[in-house]
UniProtKB/Swiss-Prot annotation:
Protein name in the entry: Calcineurin B homologous protein 1
Localization: Nucleus; Cytoplasm; Cytoplasm, Cytoskeleton; Endomembrane system
Superkingdom of origin: Eukaryota
Membrane topology per record: Lipid-anchor
Length: 195
């Protein structure tokens, strides 16, 4: 299987993915091997069902939301490039990246892009704001039936009251960023990938 992974990924593809995502050559080849092992249809793409076979996602209360983040609107398959773009949001920021070229595109693992990614997990209807109902749905996914609907409603109301600065009873991206300004998002939204 290891040889299959390395023969199907060309060096120029690896270089393009490195440039776009910041992953190292060895990380890309290792993740490609993982990608091909998940690709049960052996067609070079992953389906939602392929992702649902990953135990860590299957038990994660936000697993479905995370899985959906891998897929473009209306798509039911993701190729390796799209898979890597999404994973790049979770790549830790290295010290040498903090002083990167300011004129280049913002890295996918920047604080801003990590916040946009997290915001989209809550913004279920993609209207660029988190409503009380959306917050309730995500809270319900996270806590299950361990908290009453009344308690969840109280948590959602208090969260929106504290975050909502413009009085529209919803949380905009700017308000979301403000609430999380003291949170180490770079660390909390990072997964260590082996080199």
């Amino acid at each position: 299987m290891g040889s299959r992974a390395s023969t199907l990924l060309r060096d120029e593809e690896i270089e393009e993915i490195k440039k776009e995502t910041g992953f190292s050559h060895s990380q890309i080849t290792r993740l490609y091997s993982r990608f091909t092992s998940l690709d049960k249809g052996e067609n070079g793409t992953l389906s939602r069902e392929d992702f649902q076979r990953i135990p860590e996602l299957a038990i994660n209360p936000l697993g479905d939301r995370i899985i959906n983040a891998f897929f473009s609107e209306g798509e039911d398959q993701v190729n390796f490039r799209g898979f890597m773009r999404t994973l790049a949001h979770f790549r830790p920021i290295e010290d040498n990246e903090k002083s990167k070229d300011q004129n280049g595109p913002e890295p996918l693992n920047s604080r801003s892009n990590k916040l946009h990614f997290a915001f989209r997990l809550y913004d279920l209807d993609k209207d660029d704001k988190i409503s009380r109902d959306e917050l309730l749905q995500v809270l319900r996914m996270m806590v299950g039936v361990n908290i009453s609907d009344e308690q969840l409603g109280s948590i959602a109301d208090r969260t929106i009251q504290e975050a909502d600065q413009d009085g529209d009873c919803a949380i905009s991206f700017a308000e979301f960023v403000k609430v999380l300004e003291k949170v180490d998002v770079e660390q909390k939204m990072s997964i260590r990938f082996l080199h």
